[in-house]
Regions:
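Active-site neighborhood of HAD-like aspartate-dependent phosphohydrolases
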Residues: 3-77, 94-97
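Short, acidic loop-to-helix structural element flanking the phosphoryl-transfer center
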Residues: 16-18, 24, 29, 139, ...
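A general structural signal for alpha-helical elements within enzymatic catalytic domains
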Residues: 52-56, 101, 227-230
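Cytosolic catalytic headpiece
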Residues: 62, 85-100, 105, 111-118, ...
């Protein structure tokens, strides 16, 4: 089994791996998240909960009053997918930062202004255009939201990681003491395999002898995925 992250594709090492896959036999390459592993209750839920928590932290004492009519969590699964499809937000930490900023700006910086009426789906459409034009992702975020509404990338990262890994695994993998959700159990435990057990043998019977995974997962996320796919 060969791992190839997208940013390695044009490196000597990446080209070597691809050559190994292609040498003399058919190969099947799979994406991981959403294809081989169901991440609806892990990565996606972590983004939603992290956005909600970080938005409340950013708003401080005004949070309850400003979010009176807001949904809980502040972001729905379909809205997360729209931003993923837009481009520029494959990194969940960047997406958490962006969604938090849009919510903070909506209820505080843009309060009473036309921007406050723009839905997340509409923002995702704008993000898609920006990505197509070469200035998507976090760069686009700083173009549309004021700096006062944007949380630090470090805070966005760790609140997401604490929800995803949980307190115990955050300490184990990163030596990180949780400060946002210290009692989080970890949504990573909700991940499960999507691929039917008969698929790989079926492909092998058709002549596919090499299988690979193409993924943006990194660090401890990789063995975590392997444990699900090959327990």
């Amino acid at each position: 089994m060969v791992w190839l992250r997208p940013n390695l594709a044009n490196t000597p090492q990446g080209r070597g791996w691809l050559a190994a896959l292609e040498a003399g036999s058919a190969a099947a390459l799979f994406d991981v998240d959403g294809v081989l592993i169901d991440v609806t209750g892990s990565y996606r839920r972590s983004v939603a909960e992290a956005t909600t928590t970080l938005t409340r932290i950013m708003l401080g004492a005004e949070a309850d009053a400003l979010l009176t009519d807001a949904p809980s969590p502040l972001v729905m699964h379909d809205e997360i997918i729209l931003f993923k499809l837009a481009g520029g937000f494959n990194n969940d930490w960047d997406l958490t930062q962006a969604l938090t900023a849009l919510w903070v700006a909506r209820v505080r910086e843009w309060r009473g202004q036309p921007q406050a009426q723009i839905t997340l789906a509409e923002w995702a459409a704008q993000a898609r255009i920006a990505a197509h034009d070469g200035h998507g992702g976090v760069r686009w975020l700083y173009e549309v939201a004021s700096a006062s509404a944007i949380p630090s990338s470090d805070d966005a990262r760790w609140v997401h990681e604490e929800y995803y890994w949980g307190a115990e695994l955050a300490r184990h993998h990163f030596g990180h003491t949780p400060r946002f959700v210290p009692d989080a159990p970890g949504f990573v435990h909700a991940e499960c395999a999507l691929l039917d057990a008969s698929v790989l043998p079926g492909l092998a019977a058709q002549g596919v002898s090499r299988f690979g995974l193409i993924t943006g997962r990194d660090g401890p996320e990789i063995p975590s995925a392997l444990n699900i796919l090959a327990p």
